[in-house]
C-alpha cells in the first residue's frame, strides 16, 4: 500500500464547522480550567489542612477529618477513573437529575427542556472536564503548598499570624506562583481531552472531523487537519509554560 492520495479540497466547504469546533474547544478549556482552579484550590486547602494546628473543639477536629476524607475520595475517584466514563456519567446520569423538565434539582419545566436542547452537551462536557480538572489541580496545589519550607510557616506563627493568615499572606502567594507552569500543562491536557466530549454530540473539533469523514468516507484529511489545530493550540500553551518557568529577569520583567 502506497502513500494516501490526500484531497485537501474536501475540507473547504466545512471551514466554518472547523472554526466553530476550534472555538468550542477553546471555550471548553477556558471554562474547565477556571472552574477547576476554584474547585482545586478548595480541595487542595482541605487536603493540606492536616498540617494546621489542632482545633480546640472536638467537633471541629472531627469535621476537618471528614472533609479531608471526602476530598481524598473525590480526588481518588476522578484521578482513578477514565475521563470518558466521567463524561458519560455526567451527561446521562447526573444531567437528568440536575436539569429535567419534570423535576430537575436546578431547573425544571420548559426552561429545562430548552436548556438541554440548546446547551445540554456543552454544560455536561464543561462540568465533567471541570470536575476532573479540579481533582488534578488540587494535587498541584497540595504539592505547591508542601514545597514551601516549613520554616516560613513557623516564622509567621512566631510573629503572631494565625494559620489562616499564614496561608493567605505567606504560603499561598508563593505556592500559586510555583503552580503556574503546572496549571498551563493541565490546560494543555484539557485541550486534548476535550475531544472526548464529541461522544455526547458537542460540536467541537473531533465532531467536525467525524462529520467530514462520514460525508466523504475519507479519514486522513479531516483528522490530520484537526491534529494540526490541536498541535498549534498546545504548542502555544507549552511555550507559555516554558516562558513562565523562566526567571523574571529573562522574561524581560
Regions found by a protein language model. Name each.
Residues 1-253:
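Transmembrane alpha-helices and adjacent helix-loop boundaries
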Amino acid at each position: 500500500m502506497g502513500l494516501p492520495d490526500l484531497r485537501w479540497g474536501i475540507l473547504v466547504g466545512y471551514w466554518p464547522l472547523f472554526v466553530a469546533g476550534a472555538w468550542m474547544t477553546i471555550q471548553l478549556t477556558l471554562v474547565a480550567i477556571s472552574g477547576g482552579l476554584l474547585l482545586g484550590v478548595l480541595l487542595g486547602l482541605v487536603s493540606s489542612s492536616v498540617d494546621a494546628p489542632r482545633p480546640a473543639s472536638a467537633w471541629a477536629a472531627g469535621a476537618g477529618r471528614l472533609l479531608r476524607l471526602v476530598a481524598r475520595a473525590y480526588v481518588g475517584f476522578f484521578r482513578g477513573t477514565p475521563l470518558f466514563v466521567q463524561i458519560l456519567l455526567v451527561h446521562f446520569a447526573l444531567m437528568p437529575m440536575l436539569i429535567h423538565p419534570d423535576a430537575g434539582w436546578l431547573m425544571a419545566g420548559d426552561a429545562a427542556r430548552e436548556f438541554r436542547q440548546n446547551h445540554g452537551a456543552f454544560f455536561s462536557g464543561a462540568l465533567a472536564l471541570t470536575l476532573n480538572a479540579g481533582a488534578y489541580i488540587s494535587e498541584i496545589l497540595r504539592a505547591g503548598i508542601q514545597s514551601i519550607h516549613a520554616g516560613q510557616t513557623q516564622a509567621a506563627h512566631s510573629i503572631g499570624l494565625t494559620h489562616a493568615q499564614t496561608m493567605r499572606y505567606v504560603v499561598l502567594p508563593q505556592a500559586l506562583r510555583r503552580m503556574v507552569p503546572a496549571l498551563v500543562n493541565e490546560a494543555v491536557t484539557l485541550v486534548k481531552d476535550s475531544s472526548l466530549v464529541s461522544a455526547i454530540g458537542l460540536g467541537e473539533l473531533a465532531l467536525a472531523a467525524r462529520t467530514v469523514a462520514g460525508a466523504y468516507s475519507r479519514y486522513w484529511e479531516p483528522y490530520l487537519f484537526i491534529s494540526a489545530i490541536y498541535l498549534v493550540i498546545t504548542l502555544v500553551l507549552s511555550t507559555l509554560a516554558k516562558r513562565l518557568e523562566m526567571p523574571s529577569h529573562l522574561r524581560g520583567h
